[in-house]
């Protein structure tokens, strides 16, 4: 029997919390760049990517249907550097996230090497749960 670790895929499905929580396993692998996904309430999320060494001009964010794609291509230094130790990675990347229906990108900011992408869920009224009022009705006479 084979066990497949779906957690790397589930982390990138934003707005599918119940599915992600039900299927996520203990082993978590992370690719470059490191990122966090925060949930402030049922309708507001934030993706934060750590992008040390990148400039705002090096980054591109696109929304293709329900697929959010973040790409980065850092400028290469003009002269070759000899590293004694290189702990900071600055390489080109493309990272995509699958958003749930009715999720919208409400904004993006790049401050101190952190790219913040804010997401909002906008449920149409016909999809949102509706409260039905219960009225008192006279009893039926038999």
UniProtKB/Swiss-Prot annotation:
Query: Which residue intervals define the domain sHSP in the entry?
Result: 26-137
Q: What is its main location?
A: cytoplasm
Taxonomically, the superkingdom here is Bacteria
* Entry's Gene Ontology BP terms: protein stabilization
> Which Gene3D superfamilies does the UniProt entry name for this protein?
2.60.40.790
Which terms are listed as keywords in the entry? Chaperone, Cytoplasm, Stress response
| SUPFAM superfamilies cross-referenced by the UniProt entry | HSP20-like chaperones
- UniProt GO cellular component terms: cytoplasm
Report whether Nucleotidyltransferase shows up as a keyword of the record: no
Q: Where in the cell is it found?
A: Cytoplasm
Q: What is known of its domains?
A: The N- and C-terminal flexible termini are involved in oligomerization and in the binding of non-native substrate proteins, and are essential for chaperone activity.
Q: What does this protein do?
A: Associates with aggregated proteins, together with IbpA, to stabilize and protect them from irreversible denaturation and extensive proteolysis during heat shock and oxidative stress. Aggregated proteins bound to the IbpAB complex are more efficiently refolded and reactivated by the ATP-dependent chaperone systems ClpB and DnaK/DnaJ/GrpE. Its activity is ATP-independent.
* Family statement drawn from the similarity comment of this UniProt entry: Belongs to the small heat shock protein (HSP20) family.
> Tell me, how does this one assemble?
Homodimer. Forms homomultimers of about 100-150 subunits at optimal growth temperatures. Conformation changes to oligomers at high temperatures or high ionic concentrations. The decrease in size of the multimers is accompanied by an increase in chaperone activity.
Q: What's the protein called, per UniProt?
A: Small heat shock protein IbpB
Which organism's genome codes for this protein?
Klebsiella pneumoniae (strain 342)
């Amino acid at each position: 029997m084979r066990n497949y670790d779906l957690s790397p895929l589930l982390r990138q499905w934003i707005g599918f919390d119940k599915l992600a929580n039900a299927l996520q396993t203990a082993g978590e692998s992370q690719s470059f760049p490191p990122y966090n996904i925060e949930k402030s309430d049922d309708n507001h999320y934030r993706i934060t990517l750590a992008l040390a060494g990148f400039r705002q001009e090096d980054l591109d964010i696109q929304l293709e249907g329900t697929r959010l794609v973040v790409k980065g291509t850092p400028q290469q230094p003009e002269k070759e550097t000899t590293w004694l130790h290189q702990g900071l990675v600055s390489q080109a990347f493309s990272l995509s996230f699958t958003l749930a229906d009715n999720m919208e990108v409400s904004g993006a900011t790049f401050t101190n090497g952190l790219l913040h992408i804010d997401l909002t869920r906008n449920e149409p009224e016909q999809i949102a749960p509706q409260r039905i009022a219960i009225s008192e009705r006279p009893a039926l006479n038999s």
